Structures are given as C-alpha cells and as structure tokens.
C-alpha cells in the first residue's frame, strides 16, 4: 500500500452547522491525517475556477452559489491509499445512495448540500491541493 496525499473540502452547508470537528474526526478515525488545513470564504471567481470541469453542467450556477455562500475548510489529507479511503469515508455524492456511517449519509442535506468534496484521482488531488496550498503550508 502506498502513502498518498489527497484534497478534502468541508463545504459551507456543513461549516454553517458546525460540523467541521465531527467530519474531521470521521476522516481521522479512518486513518487519514490532516497535514494542512485552512478556513476560506471562496469568491464566486474562485468557485468557478475550482469547479471549471463542471462549467457546462446544468448544476454549475447552483454549485458556484453554494460554494461561495459561506466558509469552507480546505484540507490536505495523508495516509495509506488516501484518495480511495477519503472517497469511501465521504460516501456517494447523493446521500440517499451513501452507505450507513459515511459522512454524506450522516451529515448531508441533499445531493447539492452534501457536506464534503474530495479528489477523485492522484492527478486531481495534485491540482486541487496546488489550487489552495503552497508547499510551505503542507506540514507532513
């Protein structure tokens, strides 16, 4: 097994409900270690750029609005197979489809307000980490 780094985000719908600690605990209990973390309030421009891959999708405007509606916690996680493990702990995008005990099953309000975002591949993780963090901010 390989030690990897991945990007994780606690979305505004979760920070508004003071779930930062509970969600981080679920990630840490799964063996992931937070090696960088900061609280940001994403501008509309940042949200558009970060989620540019979804620009042509019907939900893009709603996503940008949600992501710029309040504070977000951006994190770098490290651990064995961190990318897959983070996605497993997050659960399916639609909380109705998520397995019991996952972040989205426990905390999500809807498919849009689903509490968390996580990288889906090593390449995406690298890009998303670099979007929010400089190398000196990541302390492994």
UniProtKB/Swiss-Prot annotation:
Disulfide bonds: none annotated. Its EC number is 2.7.4.6. HAMAP family: NDP_kinase. It catalyses: a 2'-deoxyribonucleoside 5'-diphosphate + ATP = a 2'-deoxyribonucleoside 5'-triphosphate + ADP; a ribonucleoside 5'-diphosphate + ATP = a ribonucleoside 5'-triphosphate + ADP. NCBIfam families: PRK00668.1. Its cofactor is Mg(2+). Homotetramer. InterPro entries: NDK-like_dom, NDK-like_dom_sf, Nucleoside_diP_kinase. This is Nucleoside diphosphate kinase. Its main location: cytoplasm. The active site is at residue 117. One of its GO terms (cellular component) is cytoplasm. It is found in: Cytoplasm. Pfam families: NDK. Major role in the synthesis of nucleoside triphosphates other than ATP. The ATP gamma phosphate is transferred to the NDP beta phosphate via a ping-pong mechanism, using a phosphorylated active-site intermediate. It is an enzyme of class 2 (transferase). ATP binds at residues 11, 59, 87, 93, 104, 114. Belongs to the NDK family. One of its GO terms (molecular function) is nucleoside diphosphate kinase activity. GO terms for biological process: CTP biosynthetic process; GTP biosynthetic process; UTP biosynthetic process. CDD domains: NDPk_I. It comes from the Bacteria. Keywords: ATP-binding, Cytoplasm, Kinase, Magnesium, Metal-binding, Nucleotide metabolism, Nucleotide-binding, Phosphoprotein, Transferase.
């Amino acid at each position: 097994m390989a030690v990897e780094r991945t990007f994780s985000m606690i979305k505004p719908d979760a920070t508004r409900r003071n779930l930062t600690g509970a969600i981080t605990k679920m990630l840490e209990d799964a063996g992931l270690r937070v090696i960088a973390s900061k609280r940001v309030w994403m501008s509309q421009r940042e949200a558009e750029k970060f989620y540019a891959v979804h620009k042509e999708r019907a939900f893009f405007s709603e996503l940008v609005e949600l992501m710029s509606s309040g504070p977000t916690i951006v994190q770098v996680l490290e651990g064995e197979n961190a990318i897959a493990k983070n996605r497993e702990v997050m659960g399916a995008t639609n909380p109705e489809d998520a397995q019991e005990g996952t972040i989205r099953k426990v905390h999500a309000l809807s498919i849009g307000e689903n509490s968390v975002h996580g990288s889906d591949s090593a390449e995406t993780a690298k890009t998303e980490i670099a979007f929010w963090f400089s190398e000196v901010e990541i302390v492994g």
